[in-house]
Each structure stands twice: as C-alpha cells, then as structure tokens.
C-alpha cells in the first residue's frame, strides 16, 4: 500500500503492441526480460573469454558480470538502471532466476552419493572436518567484530551461523571444474579434494538449514525449532517414501535406450513439489530440490539423461540471471572508510587462514607431502555459486546488510580467483622421467631387451572397442599375461557445457568419490559398457586392461596422453584415425579435433605412436576363440618408422592365429620415381647407417623365420611368417605389388618410409599424418582394400617437428587446429 510521498509501481503487461502503435516494448515484461537476458549472456560470455587465459572458472566471470550491471558500475547511471533493470521488472527476473536455481541445486544434489560418504577415507574425512571447523570458528569470531561496527542490530544467532557457513563452505561444482582445468581431477590430490569437498558440502547444507530456521523474521525459538524439526521430517519422508518411487522409475530406464519423456516430467515435477514444501515449511525452496538430488539413484542411465536434458538450459540461461540478480544487490560503494576496508581485509584473511591452515596442518599430520598439502588448502578455499546462495538468503532474510553483503561477495571472488594460480605455483606434478628411468620407448627396443611390452590405446567411444580388443589379442604374443601390459584411455572433452556432475560421472570409473563400487552383477550391467567390455576380455584372455580417462579441452588433451604415456613407461601409443567408415565403405569425419590431437601427440609423445585406420579389424570381437585369425602385411621400404612397424608385426606373429607377410621393396637399377613430385631431401633417403640397421633387422627376421621352420620340422604346419622381396622399376609397380595383398586384414606401415623407392612415391592428400603409404592404403583410389591400416612412427629423441616431407598437402593441419 502506498504512503504519502511514495507510489507503488503498477504491474507490467506481458507483451506490447509494438512501437508502430505507440507503445514502448521496454515497458512490458516479456520484451524487457529478453533484453535483460541478452545483455547478461553477452557480458558474462565476453568476460569468460577474457579470463580464459588465466584459467579461471566461468563462475568468476558471471559474478563479476552481475556486479558490473549493478549499482557498483553501470547501475550508477539512473537512466540505465531505470531502462534496463527498472524496479518493477525485478520480481519477474528474480522469479525466473530462482526457478533455474532450484533445478541447479537438484543437479548439485545429484553430484553427492551418500554411499560414497561411508567409504570416504580417514584422511579425506579429517581434512574435510579441519576445513570446516577452523573457518567456522573464525567466521563466528569475525561476526563479533562486524556486529560491533557495521552490523549493529543484526540478530545474533542467525548472524553468527551465516558468517560461519559463509567462511567454511567449499563450492564443489567450481572445485571440480578447476581440478579438471588444471588436470588434477584424476590424481590422488584431486580424489582427496573431491572427497573432502563432498563431506564439506553436506555439512554446509545442514548448517545452512539451521541458519535459515533461526533467521525467521520475529520468530521465537519455539518457531525455529518447529521449522527445523519439520525440515528433518521432510528429509525422512523423502528417504523412505519418495526415494523408492524414484528408484522404480530409474529401473524402467535401461542402459542404451532413450528415457521416456513422462519419467523426466514426473521427476522435474517432484523437484518443484519438494521445493514448494520446504518453502511452505519456512526453509528455502532450494533445500527441497537439493534433497531430491541427494536421494536420487546414481546408478544407471536415468541420472545421466536428466543431466543432459536440464544442464544446458539451467547453466546457460538461468544461472547468469541469478548472478545478475545478486549483482544488483551488491554495491561496492557501501564499503567506505578505513574501517570498512580493514574489515574486508580481515574477512579475506580469516577465510583464507582458516581453510588453508586447517587443511595444511591436518594434511601434514596425515603424511601428505608439503606441496600437496598447500595445494589442498588452496583448493578447499574455493568459493562460488553456493557461497552466493548463502549470502543472498542471508540478505533476503535481513541477516546481512548491504555493506556486509558487498564485503562477503568480494571475499568470494578473491578466494576463488587466487585458487588456480596458487595451486599451479606450489604443486607441479608429472616430472619427466630420465632416460635411465624410461628406456624402452619403442617396440623395437622392447623386443631387443626382451621386456614386457607396454601399450596405450586411446579411444573416443565404444565404437572403437571391438577393433582395440582384437588388436590387443593379436599383440599378446605367446605368454598371455606377463608379457603384455595394456592401458586403455578414454578421451573425453571438457567443454564449456560440462557441469561438475557430468565430470563426476565421467571419471567415476577411476574410483573417484561418486562411483558406487559395488561389484554385484546388477551394478555391473548398468555400468559403463567400455569397462564391461575390457573386463570380459580380461576374463577370457587373462590379459589385464587398465582403464584410464582423460578429461580436458580438445586443445590440451594431447598433454594428458603424453604425460600418461611417460608415467606408465609406454612403448607405443595407438590413436584412432579421425575418420570412420560408413556402411557404404566411404569415409566420414568423426571430428576434426581428433586430427589435431593425433598431430600433437606425434610431435610431443615420449614413445612411439601409431594411428589406427579402422575398417573393422577382425570383424566382431573373437577373444580367446579357437578360430581367431588375422592376416597381417608389412610394407617395408626402410627407415626408422618401417623398422618399428616390422618390430610390432613380428611381436604379433608370436600369436598362433596370426599370419604375417613382410614385403620388402627393392629398387631396380632403372627405378624411376613418379614424374609429379616435390624435391627429394636427404631425410627421405636412407643414410648408410640407417641402411645397415635395416639390413640387420631383415637379417634377424630371416633368422626368426628359419628358427620357426626348424621348430616345426616334425609337423605339417607352415611358418606363420613369410618374407618376400619385390624389385620394382617405378611407382606403378609399387601399386601393383600392394594390390596383391589387398585381402589382408591389417597393413602395418611406417609414417615416414625412407629409401629411393619411398622417395619416388608422391601422394596428394589432406592427411599427412598417415604418411605416403598410409594415404595410399586409406584414401587413394589406386589401391582398393578393406583392410585396416596401422601407421607407425618410431620415437626418436631428435625427430624434427613437422609433417612427413614426401606428402603433398592440399590443406594445412595448422588451420584445422585453430578450432579447438
């Protein structure tokens, strides 16, 4: 109701009739809301782009963007604030922002698996408790200083609890994002940080519920008790009544099948109903959505499907509105005078001191190294959206005034902003191994030293698994177990849309805190099909495949591959080609980013690298089957890469189901290279030393064939290895020879073959990473084959960075690499 000297703004109509009928669209709710959303998205995305080189999470850009649109910056202009964010429009903006926040808190609850808290190690639990207790105590101490100065009149008990929660909270979604950005998500320190943050999150929400119950306007202690007890009753009702119903829905959503739209609508309806109940009780509506997320079953397909459907709309559209709604309440200008700025420094110091010192001391007591302890302290000091939620609830309930609210928002920005640079400064994992530590960087060296072969297979999706399994089976040699070590790395993109819950689901196979490790058959059937496939292979072949996960932006995921290869002392990394074969046998690009990854790994890998051009190697998976057989052909021209391909093929030939043919090309005296070609350089011609090593490799191969023939003299079986020499006069004869072996299952070729025959081959191609022979077998119409191709590059410490010199490119790889 209006009073003398004041007027209440009238309600806004939803839509306008347009400017041509004399109406201003900005005086109507819908067009004004659209303008607000566009401005918010444009500003926050621009700030996120500017902060990307500093490796800051997007939440920093969104908080700063909200502040810039508020009274601290652009909002100082009366014309701007009355035009774009007039007071009468804020109810619609706040309602839409809080609706999105309800669903975001549901996603936050989905991140937490209560079962994982039971399995949290003593070390992570101790670190979490220390990271809560000391900051909470310091927060209470800080609140006394604030109440005696700038917060005089604030309710004592609610103010103490709100300040304690604000200083002790760790923003789990932001922490997960930062860990992934700095490549610590799957490390030991990342596991400890996530486990501790999970415990911290649960404790913080319980304390927040208590603070909300205490902060009712004019409420008596008895009323606060009723609110708190009603909240406890709501949680019990959700656990014993709502959760069984949701589990029934989840069981009706089997893995690999689309989720029924009705189930999604029912679940979102349950989230809204729970929010209504908690708001009706007197606890904030967000609490109900969070509880539903916590009790939601994490196994199976349903949780992932919900995240996929809700994530983009919530994080991309609704959440930035909440940051603006918060920024409109933040006025940095209220922090005036030495006293106020001194209190800001005090709040920041206590927030950092409590979290960092508490975490570091307990970590050192748990025998965590000093650099990791410091990194954990900085990581646990991460604030973010959850911090803003606590502060906004406190301000809306009158517990925090404008000045304290601004101080706490600046504290949240500062502590989060400093996390990444400080962690990178104190913790530098992944030191390169010395040559003495890591000797067998190639298959050729491994065979020579008679050591177990270590391979790393990278894959993009389950589509790659059958071929990988068949290639592993072919590589196991005679002794199935001790002579082969295999790592399978799943390449997953960390994109802008990846929420913490998606990342948690992606890395749960590595044993992070939100993975149900129950090994029952029911859980196994609903777990990741990739892990199931490798587990089945292990049981049948007795070759252990260790799953790994790389979660990074496409522009830097090659660093994960190279670092993992060095850490595991791998002899060869095998990468999938960036194209796949369609049913009509034509090539289709899976994703051009994978081509960039292959190029960068070839340049920076600490071991040999191979690119697998898959045309369905061996058909369907036939592990440990008596009819497992592959016909493999090595096209040998000479040089380091060809010898590495030969060494890998000889290793495969130890398998009883493998038939290997080695074809060596020898130029005749009148050999003529192809007419259209580029200049031949010395790098393409075998040096005398290289030629001698090639001859030695061929001599060893002949001796091996002779040994096999003598060992089989008492049987009618033939040798599995055939060596042939082909004397060629020109490029066309090379093509004709290759055609003779077009029915092979697999070709092994070097990326950069050497010698006069190889130097005479000129192939125009847009995939120079395959080399001339790989391109000939893959994309040239001269050779028609359905065989898969493995293009091998041997590790050489002094290998120059760049593409193969005997491939004429029609487009530059560097241009393609600009997109990631």
UniProtKB/Swiss-Prot annotation:
Keywords: Antiport, Ion transport, Membrane, Phosphoprotein, Potassium, Potassium transport, Transmembrane, Transmembrane helix, Transport. InterPro entries: Cation/H_exchanger_TM, CPA2_transporter, Na+/solute_symporter_sf. Disruption phenotype: Decreased K(+) content in roots. Induction: Up-regulated by NaCl, K(+) starvation and abscisic acid (ABA). Induced at acidic external pH. It comes from the Eukaryota. GO terms for biological process: potassium ion transport; protein targeting to vacuole; proton transmembrane transport; regulation of pH. Predominantly expressed in epidermal and cortical cells of mature roots but also barely detected in leaves. It is found in: Membrane. GO terms for cellular component: late endosome; membrane. The modification Phosphoserine is found at residues 817, 819. PANTHER family: CATION/H + ANTIPORTER, CATION_H(+) ANTIPORTER 17. Operates as a K(+)/H(+) antiporter that controls K(+) acquisition and homeostasis. Belongs to the monovalent cation:proton antiporter 2 (CPA2) transporter (TC 2.A.37) family. CHX (TC 2.A.37.4) subfamily. Could complement the kha1 deletion phenotypes in S.cerevisiae. This is Cation/H(+) antiporter 17. It comes from Arabidopsis thaliana.
